[in-house]
């Protein structure tokens, strides 16, 4: 049953991103369509990497838990770097990007928030890749969560600060 779910879930996610991209195209935003299609392919690739890691663990018991955590940390870091690349390209929308009430309030705030947030995600991604090499086991998992939560908090503060600056 697990293998069936692992096969169907990435297909469902791909279809979701495909239909979201097509809805953006109907709204007249071909730039957001392209960003969503690229993001969908990135998520698909990430899910396939998780499936490969799971299969390799099932096939070979030589892979220990620490190796799996390192691989997941590295993948998370790469996803953050990938997001950093895509964020500045997205126009204001309700699907993809740093979407807070402040960033959605104005196109100028949106663009500046995405640009500044991309640096936060790039640094967070690099930290996660470095942590995957340096740290082991449970401490690596704690650092994954800490970096992710800290990045989200910083990005939220950035969008508020940009909104406040442009409000004046």
Regions found by a protein language model. Name each.
Residues 33-72:
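Long, highly hydrophobic alpha-helical transmembrane signal-anchor segments
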Residues 6, 14-18, 36-46, 111-123:
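Select subsegments of transmembrane alpha-helices in polytopic membrane proteins
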Residues 1-11, 65-83, 146-147:
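Alpha-helical transmembrane segments
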Residues 11-25, 82-98, 159-165:
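Membrane-water interface of transmembrane alpha-helices
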Residues 130-145:
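Extracellular/periplasmic helix-loop-helix junctions in multi-pass membrane proteins
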Residues 27-28, 91-113:
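Cytosolic, membrane-interface loops and tails of multi-pass inner-membrane proteins
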Residues 16-28, 48-61, 131:
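Membrane-helix exit/interface motif
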Residues 80, 123-131:
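Hydrophobic, membrane-inserted alpha-helices
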């Amino acid at each position: 049953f697990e293998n069936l779910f692992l096969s169907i879930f990435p297909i469902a996610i791909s279809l979701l991103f495909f239909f979201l991209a097509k809805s953006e195209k109907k709204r007249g935003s071909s730039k957001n369509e392209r960003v969503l299609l690229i993001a969908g392919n990135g998520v698909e690739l990430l899910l396939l990497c998780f499936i490969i890691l799971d299969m390799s663990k099932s096939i070979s018991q030589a892979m220990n838990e620490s190796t799996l955590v390192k691989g997941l940390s590295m993948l998370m870091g790469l996803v953050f770097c990938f997001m950093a690349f895509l964020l500045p390209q997205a126009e204001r929308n309700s699907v993809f990007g740093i979407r807070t009430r402040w960033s959605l309030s104005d196109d100028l705030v949106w663009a500046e928030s995405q640009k500044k947030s991309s640096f936060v995600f790039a640094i967070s991604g690099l930290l996660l890749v470095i942590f995957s090499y340096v740290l082991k086991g449970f401490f690596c998992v704690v650092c994954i969560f800490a970096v992710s939560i800290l990045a989200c908090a910083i990005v939220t503060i950035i969008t508020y600060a940009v909104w406040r600056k442009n409000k004046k």
